[in-house]
A protein has these predicted regions:
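Conserved alpha-helical scaffold segments that buttress catalytic/binding sites
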Residues: 2-241
Length: 241
């Protein structure tokens, strides 16, 4: 489907910015294809999608999804993927399809802000140029700033705790809902998971689109899939592709 057809990243940019200790050789990470399937089709895969270089110089690889999924819930486009920077591409995909206008608000449910500095400018001429920007010039921690710089996003509301999610009021205008499932990682200490799910479901129902990252480095992927299934379990038409 479009640019996401499955490919290897083999250079030192984007999420491939770690190098082996003994050789100047870039790591090799897999980017899954995007398919139209429902929640029940979420599967893990055996190829590495992220790596971390530890202080002793060793590389640890992390594994993600077999396929990225897209489907609709109540007419709202949903995208599920592993590394969070892919969200930027899907925002542009829906923007180019006139789902929303530039200057849209982003509601960001996550452990992290994902707003580390990124001085690179997006070439917005088409989705292909956006795709390669996402792969080569972004990583999981710095993909939001370029969207603010281009004007695609007008503002960002950061919901990084249970308290802020549960006390958040729906904005008046259009918004994108961006979710990192590591928000429900055990160390976050969520006390009422179902209540946070219910608030998230409401935000999904009103959104122009929803992007969901499983974040292999920050969350066990079996747990991520389980949480996504629980989140959508109470939503009608949850697997409409």
């Amino acid at each position: 489907m479009e640019n996401y057809r499955g490919l290897w990243l083999e250079w030192g940019n984007g999420n491939c910015f770690f190098w082996s200790q003994e050789e100047w050789k870039p790591v090799k990470l897999w980017v899954a294809p995007l398919v139209k399937k429902g929640i029940s089709e979420l599967e893990l895969w055996e190829e590495p999608v992220f790596c971390e270089r530890w202080t002793n110089g060793t590389l640890e690889y992390f594994y993600g999804l077999k396929e990225f999924l897209t489907f609709e819930v109540w007419g709202v486009p949903i995208y599920i993927f592993d590394n969070h920077n892919h969200a930027l591409y899907f925002w542009y995909k829906e923007y180019f399809q006139n789902c929303f206008a530039k200057g849209v608000k982003l509601i960001h449910i996550d452990q992290h802000s994902d707003m580390k500095p990124n001085d690179e400018k997006i070439d917005e001429k088409n989705l292909n140029s956006v795709f390669w920007f996402v792969q080569e010039q972004c990583n999981v921690g710095n993909f939001i700033i370029p969207a603010l710089g281009s004007g695609l996003l007008g503002s960002v509301d950061q919901l990084r705790s249970e308290y802020w999610l549960l006390h958040y009021d729906k904005p008046d205008g259009d918004y994108i809902l961006d979710i990192d499932m590591d928000f429900w990682e055990k160390m976050m200490g969520i006390e009422d998971k179902e209540w946070t799910f219910e608030q998230t479901r409401k935000l999904i129902s009103w959104a122009k689109m929803v992007t969901i990252a499983t974040s292999p480095f920050f969350l066990d992927q079996k747990e991520a899939i389980k949480l996504i299934q629980e989140l959508f379990d109470e939503m009608e038409d949850k697997s409409e592709a």
